């Protein structure tokens, strides 16, 4: 059985690695804004994302935070201001 989770990935990495992290995450998730991605992943894809990020970042200098939810329905997403990456969301 394939388990699907909804994830939000936020990162603060050295400028030398920002583009590599962004390019890597775009293969799996939707870009929301600078240093923030979200989307649905299988458990296997989530493990691939974590392994790939570990290969890119320097854990002594960088930080990546992964929020994991059972589904996109597990939380409410509200956007204030101009939406950069995803379309069709409610703007408050």
From Swiss-Prot:
The lineage of its organism: Archaea, Methanobacteriati, Methanobacteriota, Archaeoglobi, Archaeoglobales. CRISPR (clustered regularly interspaced short palindromic repeat), is an adaptive immune system that provides protection against mobile genetic elements (viruses, transposable elements and conjugative plasmids). CRISPR clusters contain sequences complementary to antecedent mobile elements and target invading nucleic acids. CRISPR clusters are transcribed and processed into CRISPR RNA (crRNA). Functions as a ssRNA-specific endoribonuclease. Involved in the integration of spacer DNA into the CRISPR cassette. It comes from the Archaea. Its cofactor is Mg(2+). The keyword Cytoplasm does not apply. This is CRISPR-associated endoribonuclease Cas2 2. It holds the Pfam family CRISPR_Cas2. Belongs to the CRISPR-associated endoribonuclease Cas2 protein family. HAMAP family: Cas2 (MF_01471). The keyword Cytoplasm does not apply. PANTHER family: CRISPR-ASSOCIATED ENDORIBONUCLEASE CAS2. SUPFAM superfamilies: TTP0101/SSO1404-like. GO terms for molecular function: metal ion binding; RNA endonuclease activity. The gene is cas22. GO terms for biological process: defense response to virus; maintenance of CRISPR repeat elements.
